């Protein structure tokens, strides 16, 4: 199926690219000003931009006929899905950049852009211009923890904690719904994962965690050295009893890592109220930031260990890099990733306030109530929803159409795409995941009606 694009969006991108070409003219010029050849190049690009702007305005009558877009960035296709579609992809929704983050990328996209004013003690979290040092303090206060560091994704937060606390052969408690990166972090540190089984509702409980700790102690003769549990897991986005599990961890004297990959940045998170020793979040999943980005926050009790500085001394040069943090490999996010986090932060703080998160969950439940009206469409995640990410089952509805359709499961993708909806797993009509985070009520209602319209088209029963 050939996807046609909105010409106004296409020309908007072309105008943006032409502006970047103008920017390159200035970058290549002398500090004293443009040469005559550079002035001509500038005027040519300005004329090109005016043409695009006129076309964008003219195409506004009826929004223009959709057409195939062949624009390229070198060999790369231009990504326009966020401008052209309602995107319900399960892991992209809350990583969508704010306008401020996109602007920050324009200004700070160069490699070591954070290092313009790096002075002693030569460490990322000590840089004051731009305000990276202050941002680290803001992160810690926002999460109600004592110290925080930015890291290249939540996985690097898991890795840093495991590296600091886990020795070869140590047991680490994780959920039976844990993300693979939690496994890898433990494995790299030489530890062994021990999974807390989920119950019939696909939930991880405090009692089950306590039982697992006892099982580990009985079989190994030692307590686990770390407990890592997701607040909302990636498979179902079910809410797990992190408060109760944190209490169990405290009772046994085991450090507790709160995995907030699906909460930090969209929902209220108070690390000390939870009882967490570590809070890990994902910038590119939930904080409207460029990948890879994330946050690791901890208490003063554990900061000296997880943020320890190097003691290594060169045997020939006698060099020592004492300010560099071992688990973080020194500096972490040295460019546009970090600046996008900083630029998005005010919006992220606002959107994660309780009333805003509650509204997002209401929209998720509204859509799913309409979705469930199609007989045979079910929600596999806990119901009613407490999150915007949801696992659904359409085996008894849209999959019945797929069984006889010449396009098989791809018919569903075709129908959704034709309605301006994208992000479901193309070809999947049995079990799959979606995320409504960030959609307006208008888009939520449009999305709901689109699913019902497809059901009507194929004579699927609707309650």
Swiss-Prot record:
Coiled-coil zones: none
Domain of life: Archaea
SUPFAM superfamilies found in the cross-reference section: PLP-dependent transferases
Residues modified to N6-(pyridoxal phosphate)lysine: 285
Cofactor: pyridoxal 5'-phosphate
Keywords associated with the record: Protein biosynthesis, Pyridoxal phosphate, Transferase
EC numbers: 2.5.1.73
Protein residues bound to pyridoxal 5'-phosphate: 154-155, 259, 282-284
Enzyme class per UniProt: transferase
InterPro entries the record matches: Aminotrans_V_dom, PyrdxlP-dep_Trfase, PyrdxlP-dep_Trfase_major, PyrdxlP-dep_Trfase_small, Sep_Cys-tRNA_synth_arc
Reactions catalysed, as given in the entry: O-phospho-L-seryl-tRNA(Cys) + hydrogen sulfide + H(+) = L-cysteinyl-tRNA(Cys) + phosphate
GO BP annotations, alphabetical order: translation
Signal sequence interval, chain numbering: none
Recorded GO MF terms: Sep-tRNA:Cys-tRNA synthase activity
Pfam families in the record: Aminotran_5 (PF00266)
Alphabetized HAMAP family for the sequence: Sep_Cys_tRNA_synth (MF_01675)
Annotated family: Belongs to the SepCysS family.
Free-text function comment from the UniProt entry: Converts O-phospho-L-seryl-tRNA(Cys) (Sep-tRNA(Cys)) to L-cysteinyl-tRNA(Cys) (Cys-tRNA(Cys)).
Subunit field text: Homodimer. Interacts with SepRS.
Annotated protein name in UniProt: O-phospho-L-seryl-tRNA:Cys-tRNA synthase 2
């Amino acid at each position: 199926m050939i996807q046609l694009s909105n010409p106004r969006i296409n020309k908007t991108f072309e105008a943006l690219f032409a502006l970047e070409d103008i920017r390159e003219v200035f970058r290549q010029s002398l500090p004293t000003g443009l040469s005559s050849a550079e002035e001509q190049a500038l005027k040519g690009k300005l004329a090109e931009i005016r043409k695009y702007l006129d076309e964008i305005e003219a195409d506004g009558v009826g929004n223009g006929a959709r057409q195939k877009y062949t624009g390229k960035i070198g060999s790369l296709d231009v990504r326009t899905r966020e401008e052209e579609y309602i995107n319900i992809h399960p892991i992209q929704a809350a990583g969508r950049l704010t306008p401020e983050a996109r602007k920050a990328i324009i200004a700070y996209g160069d490699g070591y852009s954070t290092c313009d004013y790096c002075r002693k003690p030569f460490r990322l979290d000590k840089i004051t211009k731009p305000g990276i040092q202050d941002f680290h303090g803001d992160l810690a206060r926002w999460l109600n923890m004592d110290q925080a560091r930015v890291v290249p994704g939540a996985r690097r937060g898991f890795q840093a904690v495991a590296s600091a606390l886990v020795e070869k052969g140590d047991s680490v408690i994780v959920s039976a719904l844990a993300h693979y990166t939690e496994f890898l972090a433990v494995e790299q540190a030489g530890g062994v994962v021990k999974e807390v089984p989920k119950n019939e509702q696909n939930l991880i409980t405090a009692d089950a965690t306590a039982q697992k700790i006892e099982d580990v102690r009985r079989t190994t003769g030692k307590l686990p050295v770390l407990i890592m549990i997701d607040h909302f897991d990636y498979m179902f986005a079910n809410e797990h009893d992190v408060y109760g599990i944190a209490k169990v961890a405290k009772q046994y004297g085991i450090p507790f890592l709160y995995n907030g990959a699906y909460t930090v940045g969209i929902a209220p998170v108070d690390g000390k109220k939870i009882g967490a020793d570590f809070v890990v979040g994902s910038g590119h999943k939930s904080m409207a930031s460029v990948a890879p980005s994330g946050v690791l926050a901890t208490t003063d009790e554990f900061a000296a260990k997880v943020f320890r500085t190097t003691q290594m001394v060169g045997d020939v040069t006698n060099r020592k890099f004492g300010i560099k943090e071992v688990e973080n490999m020194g500096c972490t996010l040295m460019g546009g990733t970090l600046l996008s986090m900083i630029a998005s932060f005010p919006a992220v703080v606002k959107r994660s306030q309780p009333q805003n998160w509650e509204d997002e969950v209401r929209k998720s439940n509204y859509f799913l109530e309409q979705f469930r009206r199609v007989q045979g469409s079910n929600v596999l995640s806990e119901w009613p929803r407490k999150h915007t990410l949801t696992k659904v089952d359409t085996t008894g509805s849209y999959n019945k159409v797929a069984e006889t359709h010449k396009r098989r499961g791809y018919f569903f993708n075709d129908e959704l795409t034709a309605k301006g909806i994208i992000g479901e797993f193309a070809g999947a009509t049995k079990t799959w995941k979606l995320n409504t985070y960030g959609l307006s009520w208008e888009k939520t209602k449009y999305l709901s009606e689109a699913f019902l319209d497809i059901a009507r088209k194929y004579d699927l029963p609707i309650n």
